[in-house]
Amino acid sequence: MLSYLIGCAFGRWDIRYATGEQAAPELPDPFAPLPVCPPGQLQNAQGLPARPEDVPATYPITIQWDGIIADDPTHPVDIERCVREVIEVIWKDRANAIEQEACEILGVNSLRDYFRRPAGFFADHLKRYSKSRRQAPTYWPLSTASGSFTLWIYYHRLDDQTLYKCIQQFIDPKLADVEKELTHLRAVLAANEGGAKERKRLEELETLRRELIELRTELELWAPKWKPNLNDGVLITAAPLWKLFHLPKWQKDLKACWQELEKGDYDWSHLAYTLWPDRVREKCKSDRSLAIAHGLEDLCDVKAPEKKVKKAKKKAVVELDLEGGNE
């Protein structure tokens, strides 16, 4: 359920189906071509994923079109606040009871507790979006070392500006707030006006400040180089950011994928060409399939195989002696 609620907040799913404002879509003809969007997705008039201009001003919730939501109670785009908005629109006066029941079923004290634990929402989400060896989580948590601050990003909205937006719209404002509170607490303690509570809060903020700077540094490192292309798949696209995921199994898989990328095992990917263009271009000279994948056939020294002309098979002609002369 919570995966659906987050999807509504990101604009993946159309909440009006859940409220009854729109009738459930008809079952498609089993022999018809597959639609671009699955049933229930927020779509435009052409049946494509909706964009901001496609959604009316009367739409029931605020959609996070940038594809970024913070786990931060002080931020207006906070994951608990966004999910609660969806719950309130769907269940109205039963919203609090539904939220409490969900927390009891999940065995957590609050929705935030469930989202913040590495073995909570993301572990369940990863399991649900994995099949055989394919792992394709849609909602990614990029976290500080302790998990005290997390940015949830929506895979299908990734672009080359996503990491810059994470820094400018979320991390920098948070750092400014932390610095302001630190300055105040230091002044209070310097004047001998504070006690154990203030000293503990000071330690917490100093740790948070250090971790936010580490998170910012890692994102700043990748922001100019990371050009996500969804055709590469989830694992390859997320691999450079492996340090920011804290579910052990997922981090291990991403790190292994990153090491394989560095070795050149996935040079067919757009990400590999973005990060190591010279290496990929050199390989394209002797690998025609790789050259075709990157649109670099002009670099390839291997000629395309000539098409073989199929010769028409001669039909065997059987002559029957109707006169009986071949007895």
Predicted regions and their residues:
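Terminal accessory regions of large proteins
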Residues: 2-327
